[in-house]
From Swiss-Prot:
Encoding gene, per UniProt annotation: atpD1
SMART domains noted in UniProt: AAA
Annotated family: Belongs to the ATPase alpha/beta chains family.
Subunit structure: F-type ATPases have 2 components, CF(1) - the catalytic core - and CF(0) - the membrane proton channel. CF(1) has five subunits: alpha(3), beta(3), gamma(1), delta(1), epsilon(1). CF(0) has three main subunits: a(1), b(2) and c(9-12). The alpha and beta chains form an alternating ring which encloses part of the gamma chain. CF(1) is attached to CF(0) by a central stalk formed by the gamma and epsilon chains, while a peripheral stalk is formed by the delta and b chains.
Membrane-topology descriptor: Peripheral membrane protein
Record lineage: Bacteria, Bacillati, Bacillota, Bacilli, Bacillales
Reaction catalysis annotation: ATP + H2O + 4 H(+)(in) = ADP + phosphate + 5 H(+)(out)
Organism: Listeria monocytogenes serotype 4b (strain F2365)
Protein name: ATP synthase subunit beta 1
CC annotations in GO: plasma membrane; proton-transporting ATP synthase complex
Length: 456
């Protein structure tokens, strides 16, 4: 069969202008194959610029590319291998192996662009997925088949918390897909080795598009990981865990591509299609009657701004929002989750039960009141508080410290053994603190313990 080929007539950064025969223009979204001295790469058609010319974004390197280079229209969007052959493997945006092992057998390939599930196919039955992490299970529980966002600035512990969630939830069984979008190479390699050491790698696929790669790679690698998860849900009818680190880099890559195309940006320099791009991606992450996709996503906050357009565009799609705060990390409390800014749709009596709901509400009330009293304490000191308020402050600090926790993934750095706290032990500990059973204990006794059973 004759190949449909075109010729590159201009190169501007990662934007390629390509000339085809007038009757053979590739459709928007189709993949084009080109060669450089570094290897074979793909580009994606994003615009028809003339009667016989298209504009394409390079999903790969352009170093060594020249005008006159031939490109081949593959006649379909980027397709990646899915199914059992990619489990236990580390792949790039094309679904090619980057773990030093042979290429996965491409028995089944799916295009990375897919429609979201129909409304009648969605499964509305939800249950709680307990993580063993105290502050998450108490304040912002994760729904099985739901979407959870970890929001925070640089260096507050998002990736470590993500790795702990991967460790704890993967132990429960099932299939996992980890997608590294524009993150550091060492984080991907470190995660791969940890999964290998813990024995859960055979049920996990790692897909990486690193921060040194082109914006096209960083924009599309999230779809590669999602497509692999969708196949497990739809064809193998499995419950899947989808971890994405970092959604901000996905949005940022889209912004770079938009700028390369010469489109006018909106507030903050983001692309004008921000809401649609995020919506198209998030709407595909859904649970159907065949199986579920439980998604946990890191979202970087530029300058710690929770009102950044990238965060705002993501908020509305999430069931649980976990906000990490620098001021809590500065106190040496990890995970540095702010219980007052974090919330979950699952925190209601229907999902968690009346006891859990009431305890979480009391914890939030005490911590909120403590924040209000903090201004008085800073100016006048504890002596100016009433006896009741002093008691509340001490209990609030005990709760704040108690919500810290040693992690399994950081054992080798801290020398402290990680803990998985069962929900009954967690609720029992909170009840005892709220009831005043430990009013005589030092606040420091509650730092980095599991439950009340660890108090000596």
């Amino acid at each position: 069969m004759k190949k449909n080929t075109g010729t590159i007539i201009s190169i501007s950064g990662f934007v390629l202008k390509i000339e085809f025969n007038e009757s053979e223009l590739p459709e928007i979204g189709f993949a084009l194959e080109y060669h450089t001295h570094q290897g074979t790469y793909l580009a994606e058609v994003v615009q028809h610029t003339g009667i016989n010319t298209v504009s394409a974004i390079a999903i790969g390197e352009v170093s060594g590319l020249a005008r006159g280079t031939e490109v081949v229209n593959l006649g379909h969007p980027i397709e990646v291998p899915v199914g059992e052959t990619v489990q236990g493997r580390m792949l790039n945006v094309y679904g090619k192996a980057i773990d030093g092992k042979p290429e996965p057998a491409a028995e089944v390939k799916w295009p990375i662009f897919r429609d979201q599930p129909l409304l009648r196919e969605l499964d509305t039955n939800k249950e709680i997925l307990y993580t063993g992490i105290k502050v998450i299970d108490l304040i912002c529980p994760i729904l099985k088949g739901g979407k959870t966002g970890l929001f925070g600035g640089a260096g507050v512990g998002k990736s470590v918390l993500m790795q702990e969630l991967i460790n704890n939830i993967s132990m429960l069984g099932g299939n996992s897909v980890f997608t590294g979008v524009g993150e550091r190479v060492r984080e991907g390699i470190g995660l791969y080795k940890e999964l290998e050491a813990s024995g859960v790698l055979p049920q996990t696929t790692v897909v990486l598009g690193q921060m040194n790669e082109s914006p096209g790679v960083r924009m599309r690698v999230a779809l590669t990981g999602l497509t692999i998860a969708e196949y497990l849900r739809d064809e193998e009818k499995k419950d899947v865990l989808l971890f994405i680190d970092n959604v901000f880099r996905f949005i940022q890559a889209g912004s770079e591509v938009s700028s390369l195309q010469g489109k006018i940006p909106i507030t903050g320099g983001y692309q004008s299609t921000l809401s649609k791009e995020v919506g198209d991606f998030q709407d595909r992450i859904a649970s159907t009657k065949n199986g579920s996709i439980t998604s946990i996503q890191c979202v970087f906050l530029p300058a710690d701004d929770i009102d950044d357009p990238s965060a705002v565009a993501t908020f509305s799609h999430l069931d649980s929002t976990i906000v990490l705060e620098r001021s809590i990390a500065a106190l040496g409390i990890f995970p540095a989750v702010n219980p007052l800014q974090s919330f979950s749709r699952a925190l209601n009596p229907t999902f968690v039960g009346e006891r859990h709901y009431q305890l979480a509400a009391q914890v939030k009330f005490i911590l909120q009141r403590y924040m209000e009293l903090q201004e008085i304490i800073n100016v006048l000191g504890m002596a100016e508080l009433s006896d009741e308020d002093r008691k509340l402050v001490h209990r609030a600090r005990k709760i704040r410290n108690f919500l810290s926790q040693p992690f399994y993934v950081s054992e080798k750095f801290t020398g402290t053994e990680g803990t998985f706290v069962e929900i009954e032990d967690l609720l029992g500990s909170i009840e005892r603190i709220l009831n005043g059973d430990y009013d005589e204990r030092s606040e420091r006794d509650f730092l980095f313990i599991g439950s009340y059973k660890d108090l000596k």
